[in-house]
Amino acid sequence: VNGSGKHNNWSIATDAGQNLLSPGATPYENAQFLLFLCAVIKAVDDYQDLLRISVATAGNDHRLGANEAPPAVVSIFLGDELNAVLEAIETDTPYKGAEKTQMKLGVDVLPKFNRDTTDRNRTSPFAFTGNKFEFRMLGSSNSIACANIMLNSAVAEALKIYADRLEGASDFETAL
């Protein structure tokens, strides 16, 4: 009765296969990652109405907001660590880094690993999950084509705005 949905895993890569939404190991790679991340955030913020329309059907509209489905309002979840990084940049304060906590499984024979700092809340409509976004509002009968056309076009526009600003800057590093 409540319908079902699917997750649209979305990322952006170069023609050589480099994932531009994968956080980098060096400051330069992180600057590139943050630029593309901010372009996606801007795109979703500016065009949330088109993203919402791209998944609208009678059955899906009934499903959204109920029974562990994402809400009908488009919002982004980045996870605590990435949110803290962006807040540090915004306030021009040093990023202190998230404290890595180990998972406590209660089983000694399994290897120890750190708790994931990205999204584990499966009801977030548009969530960053480590090296990609999951757009979780699509109904099971929806094609991903319309949502991807809207998302790709919106991100392309944001990247064009950023490229124009960076190409015209006298100091690239400061503008970035």
Language model segments and positions:
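Active-site capping/gating regions of soluble enzymes
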Residues: 1-176
